[in-house]
Amino acid sequence: ERISTGVMNELADRGYQVVIVLFGTDKTSAFPLNDKIKILLIGIPFENKYKLKAAFYLKKIINEIKPDYVINVAVPMMQVSFLAKCLGMKGKVVTWDHFTLFAGSQWGVFFRIFSAFVSHQTIVLTEQDRNSYPRLLRKKIRVIGNFVMDAKFKSNLMSKKVLSVGRLVHTKGFDILLDIWGDISKRHSDWILQIVGSGEEKENLRKKIEELHLEENVQMIPTVKNIEDYYIDASIYVSAARLEPWGLVLAEAKSFGLPIVCFDCPHGPKNIVRDGMDGNLIALNDCNEMKEKILLLMDDLELRRKYGEAARKDFECRFSKRAIFNKWTELLK
């Protein structure tokens, strides 16, 4: 929702007339919305038994406001917009998918392929995601990554802090990172690992910190609004994620000029981190290699600066608001 809201706000600022159509009866947004954006309610829950009725009302709303494009935020929305299209809804339908083709069940794969077939265009996050679709559909699929707000400041890379940000869930691999940090702290007891995030694995991770006697070397910080303060104060960014569909935090780290060490897990990191240029991509679960690359950056300020400068420049070229919205403008022209 944060990404979707950010895109809609920026499009409104750029002169596009943006109308958000919501299911249900609640107009509340978890994130601030541009005053230029209009919100309309279908007034029907997003449930299977109501989808045909919802499609009828969606067709009515869309044909009244006459947009050039109808953007489905996520593939499930396509089910209703497809029915609405069959009922006579006008406008080109674009489906914006934030997940990989094979995320979820076999039905999910079917719906994604069907969605790409019936949509005017489909937006995916990475080139890997695009290439996972059948070849005949790829010409209708565009790669537009999530944009990241430009950092006002960048780290001076002088602190003795390593940062990792994300939900405290199994796929993010914080348990692996703690094992790696247990070895690193024996050599660099003056460095601190900061883990910022909340989630179901919180207590398990706290127990692991105690078992590894890392209470003085690891700080666990709940999700915060001022996350930029932690990026600015760090010298290295690390991710031991087992799975990362895109990797918003990696792009954020680059915006602050942080060198990155992360596992080359499916599907996002290799699309963001350039191995040996602005960070290091480590073979999945090669904990020893990750430890060595982190230690190398700890011991070499000039290497941190080299990677950090390259990270910042690459962010501006590929992940900044300007770069991403050039692609949106091309799509919507």
What kind of region is each of these model predictions?
Residues 274-276, 280-288, 295-302:
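Conserved acidic donor-binding segment of nucleotide-sugar-dependent glycosyltransferases
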Residues 289, 296, 303-318, 324-330:
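A short, well-ordered alpha-helix in the C-terminal region of glycosyltransferases
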Residues 259-263:
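Short hydrophobic beta-strand element within catalytic cores of glycosyltransferases
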Residues 72-79, 97:
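Short His-centered aromatic/hydrophobic patch
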Residues 1-6, 160-186, 193, 200-207, ...:
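A conserved mid-protein helix/loop that constitutes part of the nucleotide-sugar donor-binding site
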Residues 118-152:
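Donor nucleotide-sugar binding/catalytic pocket of nucleotide-sugar-dependent glycosyltransferases
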Residues 223, 242:
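Aromatic "clamp/platform" in nucleotide-sugar-dependent glycosyltransferases that forms part
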Residues 2-49:
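N-terminal strand-loop element at the rim of the active site
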